[in-house]
Amino acid sequence: INFETIICHIIVFFAFTSAIIYLCVYILKVPIPHSFFYLGKNGLRYFSYGGIYYDQGYSNIQFGMNLNRMTGPFWEPGVYQIFLNYALYRYVVIEKSNKFVIALLLFDIFFTMSASGWLCAIVIIVIGIAKSPKFTNKSKIFIFIFLSLFGGIATKFVLFSKFSETFSNKSSAYIRMNDFLLGLKIFIENPILGIGFNNTEPFMMRNTYNDTGILGSSNGFMTIAYTTGIVGMVFVLLPFIYNIIKRKKERYKSVLYFIMIVFFNFSEPVYYFPFMMYILVKEYRKAFKNSTLSI
């Protein structure tokens, strides 16, 4: 059994169900039975559609329209895009899947309205096309220009909303920037070993600009840095770098994969999620086997 294939098939399943529910509820306005539940210490209310799609039920102004951001089976669109882009990478760069699956993943990524998700998807598509023998050089240049223009314009709209939307009267971009700076400051104060594995309380106590949860920061990579120091970062990054060096053919795939995983952790606090633990263990297993497998 290929566990990687199973994971990506599950992601595609949720991408399909999320697309159907999103289209029915928010585009076609078809009423679907749902329940409510409350999450976190602030008691944020979520709509639950059969336990496979969650939504807070409010919309944002995107492209001049009121649009709900697609969250899939998660509480946050930014987390959902991580899984979507993970599958997109595999089906574009590794396995060359059918166009329907790729289009489905891109549809969901678009409606997450996640700037980081869009950027990651565009890079994956551009590299996939650049390395594909099916496209002529002229076609590649045209597609690259189109994606760059589309990505730039679309990202501009999303980033504008990031700076204008409020969370306790502060934009999410403001919060992310300050999370990074505070995490960096704590890391500089404790560079070698950090302040302790999974110890996010000092960050929470010094955070005066936002209500911080137990994850400690919106920047997962910086949380690894300030809690475990240089030693922890070496432990996390070493197998990826080693596997890149050991790979002889198509090294760009491993480089892109490494950048993507680091980027995921920069954009969301997913550093200790089982999914990220699986990815880290997989890289160590590959390193110990001294092989150059496909991912």
Mark where each language-model region is.
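Alpha-helical transmembrane segments of multi-pass inner-membrane proteins
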Residues: C8-I32, Y53-M113, C120-K131
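Aromatic-rich transmembrane-lumenal/periplasmic boundary elements in polytopic membrane proteins
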Residues: A15-G51, V158-S171
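A membrane-periplasm/extracellular boundary helix in multi-pass inner-membrane enzymes
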Residues: I20-K29, T112, I129-S168
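Interfacial juxtamembrane loops and adjacent helix segments
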Residues: K29-R69, E201-G216, G220
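A conserved mid-to-late transmembrane alpha helix and its immediate loop/hinge
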Residues: G72, F110, Y209-I244
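Long extracytoplasmic/lumenal interhelical loops at the membrane interface
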Residues: F160-T228
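Transmembrane alpha-helices of multi-pass inner-membrane enzymes
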Residues: V255-I295
